[in-house]
From Swiss-Prot:
Cross-referenced InterPro entries: ACT-like_dom_sf (IPR045865), ACT_dom (IPR002912), UPF0735_ACT_dom-cont (IPR008310)
Record organism: Lysinibacillus sphaericus (strain C3-41)
Family, similarity comment: Belongs to the UPF0735 family.
Record Gene3D superfamilies: 3.30.70.260
Residue stretches making up the ACT domain: 80-155
PROSITE patterns cross-referenced by the UniProt entry: ACT
SUPFAM superfamilies: ACT-like (SSF55021)
Source taxon at top rank: Bacteria
Name by which UniProt lists this protein: UPF0735 ACT domain-containing protein Bsph_3944
Length: 158
C-alpha cells in the first residue's frame, strides 16, 4: 500500500517507547527543536525551522511524526490520529464506537471526501480517561476491517 507516493512500512505491530534524549540521533533531536520553533511561533515555516537548527527537510519529514517531547504527552493528554479508511457505509460510526469504548473524548473529527473508495480521517482525542494504553488503542483501530492505516501524528503540544 502506498501513502503520499511512498511505500509504507508494515505498521501493524508498532510499539511506542520512552527514551532518554541522549540516545536519540542528532537528526531526531533537531527535529524536536524544529517542531518546538514551529509550535512556539518563533518561525513561520518548516523551511525556516530546519534552516535554523541545521537539519535537512527530508530528515525533518522522516522524524516529525515519530518523535514527541515527553512533557507534552503528559501535560496535554491530547492525541491526534490519522487514519485511511475504505469508503463503506457506517465506517465512521464504527470507528467512533471503538474510540468511545476506550473512554477517549473526541475533540475534533476531520474527514475527507472519499476518492477512489478511500477517505482520510484525522481524530483529535483527549486521552485523559483512556482505559488502555496507546499501543492498544492503535491496534484496536488497525484491527477494524475497513482501516487501511492508523498512525499517531501528534501527541500533546508539538
Amino acid at each position: 500500500m502506498s501513502f503520499r507516493g511512498k511505500r509504507m512500512k508494515n505498521v501493524a505491530n508498532q510499539r511506542y517507547y520512552l527514551v532518554r534524549e541522549d540516545v536519540l540521533t542528532d537528526a531526531m533531536q533537531k527535529t524536536l527543536e524544529a517542531k518546538h520553533l514551529l509550535s512556539s511561533g518563533s518561525v513561520s515555516s518548516i523551511w525556516d525551522a530546519v534552516k535554523q537548527v541545521d537539519l535537512s527537510r527530508s530528515a525533518f519529514y522522516k522524524y516529525r511524526d515519530a518523535v514527541f517531547p515527553f512533557h507534552s504527552i503528559v501535560q496535554e493528554r491530547i492525541l491526534t490520529v490519522f487514519l485511511q479508511l475504505q469508503d463503506r457505509k457506517g465506517t465512521l460510526a464504527k470507528l467512533l464506537e471503538t474510540v468511545t469504548i476506550t473512554h477517549c473524548n473526541v475533540l475534533t473529527i476531520h474527514q475527507t471526501i472519499p476518492i477512489q473508495g478511500r477517505a482520510n480521517v484525522t481524530l483529535s482525542l483527549d486521552v485523559t480517561s483512556m482505559t488502555c494504553d496507546l499501543d492498544d488503542l492503535i491496534q484496536q483501530l488497525k484491527r477494524l476491517d475497513f482501516v487501511e492505516s492508523a498512525e499517531v501524528i501528534s501527541s500533546g503540544a508539538l
